[in-house]
């Protein structure tokens, strides 16, 4: 599935949109396209950021972040969302910090054997 949604580039963002881009910025300093699709209605980005952080980055979550990214990756596989899978498993791989282990985990997910 693909969609074409007008996105306001970061370089053109002002006011509330600029503020939301700053809030949605990743630790690497980028704003993911999944957030940028909200650029015409910044208040919807606010809700997306809040949901994302409550699921993956809330201080009360005791599961390791790498595991949460693996769960998000498996959810992406089940939803046939290559975009989300690419980003979540990239994060998981970085957090796992062992490419062979990450490859085994990915293979298990891809074969529906998590």
What is the predicted role of each segment?
Residues 1-114:
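Hydrophobic alpha-helical segments
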């Amino acid at each position: 599935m693909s969609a074409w949604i007008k996105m306001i580039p970061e370089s053109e963002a002002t006011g509330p949109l600029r503020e939301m881009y700053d809030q949605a910025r990743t630790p690497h300093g980028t704003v993911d396209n999944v957030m940028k699709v909200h650029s015409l209605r910044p208040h919807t980005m606010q809700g997306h950021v809040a949901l994302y952080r409550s699921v993956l980055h809330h201080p009360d979550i005791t599961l390791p972040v790498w595991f949460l990214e693996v769960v998000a990756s498996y959810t992406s596989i089940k939803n046939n969302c290559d975009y989300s899978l690419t980003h979540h498993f990239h994060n998981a791989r970085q957090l796992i910090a062992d490419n062979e282990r990450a490859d085994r985990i990915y293979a298990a997910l891809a074969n529906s054997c998590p």
